[in-house]
């Protein structure tokens, strides 16, 4: 690792197992709060609308989640590079503190515009773990299998948190919509002490601090001066501007990154569209049959199919959470199977594309199945549990796709993976902002059946992406500029953001 010669240099890989568990748990608690907060107002829309004198079907209510996701889109572009300059610890502590402050501000909001601003700022701070945790875990976990399990837990939590929030807010908002955010603040308070006491783990920052201590003690060695700046993603003349611009350059020049990001982006947008679609389906009282109506009538037309209360309707998200747990089990099983194949030197296991992408190929067809199931089983003559169970397939597919694609990007771009993940995170968050805004008009014009089917057809088109990558991924990467540099071993170093 090129550590300084002094024996007291803190190597994060040598931390005790208990200390590593603490760091992993701290990251999991932060990402849980980040994900939980993203959909926290979903079950409280009616109460918020009543408080601020808005119509229950006012499209502006969608902004409560969408603006949070705008913060998700912007945050990784800031906090990923920032963590490579000032370290993981100050970024995580600062952003978790910001998340807590602005969650409290949401609970105290005097009006609806103020609430929207505070939601944006919550999302901006909550985006930090999306950009930083992969690197944090890579800093301390050098065993690929252990690191893979940590990141699998990361993905399960990102799927479970948003599903739990509408259930909680649906029941709590019957007291007051403000209590929705007080509960979010309490949940953040549980995780905050864990973050406060994590150590710094980023080696280049630790080297700089250690060198400063040696200099103050009069023990600075010449080779220390020469190596302080030789580590990290930007050590060969990459300025701050270059580091911040790299995600945009990569998304334009790397087909693998672009199409993987589009696939994850649509899946992610569907995940958040469900928070708008489920209330339409499960909290209404009269069937939506797919009539074409004017915009002035469309939102009224969205009223009412099953007529469940917000709290009970929140139970519809539980099958998605169960699906996430099933996907985690499949991830572990395939990881074990692949590791065994590698030890046996099987030819297919040596190919980079087979390391994770078969999981995405398994998950991709499950999305259209879930959407067709949801769309065509949502009828008064069919018990609401039947369309709810479609979420099991969606949860499995969603998590499998994300676990596979995120790790594939890291495998493909190695030392550039931080920038690749930042680009992917920003693109998928942008899609997650835009698509849910179309939910009410789309379901109003097309009805539940055909609106869900339209999304299913798009999912079918995108489902070919992992299969194309499995067959042609290596050929595509060999002709892409950043991938070529990785394959040639340029700028090789211990990758700060490796997520295996």
Model-derived features: positions:
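Cytoplasmic helix-loop-helix junction between adjacent transmembrane helices
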Residues: 118-158
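C-terminal transmembrane bundle
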Residues: 35, 66-69, 104-110, 119, ...
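Helix-breaking motifs and short loop linkers at transmembrane-helix boundaries and internal kinks
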Residues: 37, 52-53, 86-87, 108-114, ...
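Short hydrophobic/alpha-helical segments at membrane-entry points of transmembrane helices
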Residues: 111-119, 131, 180-181, 260, ...
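Glycine-rich segments within core transmembrane alpha-helices of 12-TM secondary carriers
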Residues: 146-174, 182, 187-191, 323-328, ...
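Conserved MFS/SLC helix-loop-helix module at the cytosolic interface between two early adjacent transmembrane helices
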Residues: 74-113
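Extracytoplasmic
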Residues: 6, 19-58, 74, 129-134, ...
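Intracellular terminal tails of multi-pass secondary transporters
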Residues: 1-38, 42, 46, 178-179, ...
């Amino acid at each position: 690792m090129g550590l300084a010669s002094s024996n007291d240099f803190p190597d994060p890989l040598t931390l005790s197992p208990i200390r590593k568990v603490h760091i992993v748990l701290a990251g999991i608690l932060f990402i849980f709060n980040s994900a939980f907060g993203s959909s926290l107002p979903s079950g409280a829309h009616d109460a918020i609308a009543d408080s601020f004198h808005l119509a229950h079907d006012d499209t502006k209510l969608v902004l409560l989640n969408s603006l949070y996701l705008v913060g998700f889109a912007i945050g990784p572009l800031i906090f990923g590079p920032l963590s490579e300059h000032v370290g993981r610890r100050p970024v995580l502590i600062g952003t978790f503190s910001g998340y807590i402050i602005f969650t409290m501000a949401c609970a105290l909001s005097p009006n609806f515009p103020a609430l929207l601003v505070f939601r944006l700022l919550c999302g901006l701070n909550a985006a930090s773990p999306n950009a930083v945790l992969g690197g944090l875990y890579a800093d301390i976990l050098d065993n690929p299998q252990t690191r893979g399990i940590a990141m699998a837990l990361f993905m399960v939590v990102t799927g479970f948190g948003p599903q739990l929030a509408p259930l909680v807010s649906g029941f709590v908002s019957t007291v007051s919509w403000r209590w929705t955010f007080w509960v979010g603040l309490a949940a953040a308070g549980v995780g905050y002490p864990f973050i406060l006491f994590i150590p710094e783990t980023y080696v280049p920052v630790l080297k700089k601090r250690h060198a400063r201590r040696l200099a103050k003690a009069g023990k600075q060695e010449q080779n220390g001066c020469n190596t302080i700046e030789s580590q990290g993603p930007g050590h060969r003349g990459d300025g701050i501007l270059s580091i911040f611009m790299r995600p945009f350059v990569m998304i334009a020049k790397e087909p693998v990154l672009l199409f993987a990001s589009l696939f994850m982006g649509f899946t992610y947008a569907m995940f958040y569209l469900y928070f708008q679609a489920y209330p339409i389906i499960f909290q209404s009282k009269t069937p939506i049959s797919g009539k074409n109506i004017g915009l002035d009538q469309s939102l009224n037309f969205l009223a009412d199919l099953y007529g469940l209360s917000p709290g009970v309707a929140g139970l519809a998200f539980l099958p998605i959470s169960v699906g996430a747990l099933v996907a985690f089990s499949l991830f572990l099983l395939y990881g074990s199977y692949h590791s065994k194949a590698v030890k046996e030197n099987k030819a297919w296991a040596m190919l980079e594309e087979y390391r994770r992408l078969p999981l995405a190929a398994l998950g991709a067809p499950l999305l259209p199945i879930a959407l067709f199931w949801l769309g065509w089983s949502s009828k008064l003559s069919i018990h609401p549990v039947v369309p709810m169970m479609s979420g099991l397939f969606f949860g499995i597919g969603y998590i499998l796709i994300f676990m596979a694609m995120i790790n594939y990007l890291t495998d493909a771009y190695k030392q550039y993976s931080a920038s690749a993940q930042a680009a992917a995170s920003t693109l998928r968050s942008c899609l997650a902002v835009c698509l849910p805004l179309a939910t009410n008009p789309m379901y109003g014009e097309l009805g539940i059946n055909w609106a869900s089917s339209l999304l299913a057809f798009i999912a079918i088109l995108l489902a070919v992406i992992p299969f194309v990558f499995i067959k042609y991924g290596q050929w595509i990467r060999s002709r892409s500029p950043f991938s070529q540099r990785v394959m040639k071993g340029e700028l090789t170093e211990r990758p700060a953001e490796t997520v295996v």
